[in-house]
Amino acid sequence: MTPVSGAPRRRYSDDMRGRRSKKRRRAQHARPAYLVNADFALRSADAVLAVDLSEVPLSRVNQFAVGWMRAAFEQSRVIAMLTKGEMGHATAPNRRAFWELAVRLLWFAGIARSEREKAADAMLAHGRSTEKTTHTHMQSMGITSDIDIAAMEEFVLDASNEKAMREQVKNLTEAVMATEQNLGVIYRLWREDSTWAHATAFLAGRYAPAEGDVTMGVGKPPHIDRDLEAHRLATMAIVISAGCILADEGVPSGLASAATLAFYNEH
């Protein structure tokens, strides 16, 4: 009997595809976790940052959601690149910014829609106050300031007058405490990385450790979340939070979820 044309070839082709797939999975499992997660962070950052959100209606709330999300994925990209280059221990400033952005997006998403615009304006008012302080300090030091105070004053804000909201805007700890979700893990990582992101005594001791109370050695600060496991989970929370805010603000579902879909297509 003449065999059915192509059947053996098809089985062979399927077998080969299965073997190649298993080989890729074995190779993936053989790689260190920090490299696997760094590669994922790079792919997902590229995917999210490439999403065209120009059709999202312009509003302060939408700007905060999209802007913070993009900033977080830019930091994620830098952290991943330096981690792959064996410089992960030096990324504390980037990690600190990343954790803070994650907290802020989760906090912002947890605010009632009716209060979200006032919260955004409270953030803007706090930023304006900080810029004014910077302007004053520069003038007192005899340094020319290019901060246009008059232009900032012309910007009308409807900031929340609630003391609790103002404190949450100024103090990240208060924002964490006010968020319904338990942000304890992200907050702990932010606090830890804050130690290594500033000119602290601990940072000096890590880079120039004492050896036997006689000589000064060479060292590095600890690499928090070395394998980027918490980082990977945080990127999920970030992109989902941004999408939820946009959807809650009435952005069409396809557009509101575009970044989330781009992110999960990299899984």
Segments (PLM) and residue ranges:
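A cross-kingdom marker of C-terminal helix-rich interaction/assembly modules
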Residues: 2-267
